[in-house]
Amino acid sequence: MAWFRKDKKPRQPVRQRLEIPPDAFDKCDQCGHTDLAEKFVRNLEVCPNCDHHRRLRANEYLTILFDDGTIVEHDSDLRSADPLGFPDYPARLRKASASAGETDAILTATGMIDGLPANIGVMDFAFMGGSMGSVVGEKIARLAQRSLERKYPLLVISASGGARMQEGVLSLMQMAKVSAVLAQLGERRIPYISILTNPTTGGVSASHAMLGDAILAEPGAVIGFAGPRVIKQTLGQDLPEGFQTSEFLLEHGMVDDVVHRKDMKRVVGQLLRHMSGKPAAAGWAQG
């Protein structure tokens, strides 16, 4: 006779293990907050915990600012050559194009913002750090020329480490070329709005980025010409905390406003209507 008896209970079916896709969650690189990747996307790549503004791709920013179904891209066939015969530059261009899915570090397009036509250039940091070479300069110059011809306001969204060293002086020439055509916009009283995102540095900050009739910046964006270590070594003294952030520049009169990404389209729409003398569209007058 057995001392112990095991009750025979009906076995429960084993639940199928839930497979979570590896890209279902995302992590903020500022505060470390982990959340659903979909939540970051819905929040325009702004951390729901600390409000850190992550970098956007150029095509993503176009869809944020332009009215639905109005985007017409320009000069997508322009590609950088290798005029100086810089070692491995063609290979770097091919790698950057394959990785970023773009032909160079800027997208230019025409569309409608709050019902008003506008030309926009959006720099893409994913392509060689958003560096400004001959193609970037040419596309901005052509876009500004379109604004001159059609009297459309111009917007340029900057995200760049500066001039592209592989093109040497030809890259530096773009600063003067773009600045010259922007001066023509000023003479014709055609609005130019510059939007600074993280980072906006080097030759870009020394040219078109700081020439806007209105200069807006995203929160926490790093904006400056040289890096803090270079400046500290040159001056031989300590620098103020956060002296290259958009908030610091706002306090010292270098930018006109720091605008949250979710409010950028509304603010730009209000600026365009104010500059053009047109009344605010329905639903856009508040804020």
Regions found by a protein language model. Give the residues of each.
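A structural preference for short, pocket-lining loop segments at secondary-structure junctions
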Residues: 113-123, 139-163
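N-terminal alpha-helical interaction blocks
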Residues: 1-16
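Cys/His-rich microdomains that often coordinate metals
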Residues: 34-35, 53-54
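Glycine-rich anion/phosphate-binding loops
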Residues: 99-105, 130-145
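Residues immediately within or flanking Cys/His clusters that coordinate Zn2+
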Residues: 25, 44
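Short cysteine-rich clusters marking metal-coordination/redox-active sites
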Residues: 28-31, 47-50
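Conserved catalytic cores of soluble enzyme domains
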Residues: 158-276
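Long, charge-rich boundary regions
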Residues: 56-129
